């Protein structure tokens, strides 16, 4: 019986650059899901400057990892500006929003209680 494909939308056994997998488009938020299981969701985002996602809450802890550019993550009303190479964890259930300070790309990893 074949194994389930747990990571998708990338070529297996080949090196790649995460930021190259998703493109910034003017005024938009683009995403590419790399993995989704009952316990985790891994998604790449490309967010244009001043575009973003309005306030919402996730059912699990979410770690934002900025790959390129600069973005603002507001958690419980407190703004955090992150640049390439920086990360932040959003606690499960915390209201948060994300906005591009410049065009930016991020990897979002959400871990759910199992």
Explain the meaning of each model-derived region:
Residues 77-92:
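Short acidic-glycine-tyrosine-enriched beta hairpin
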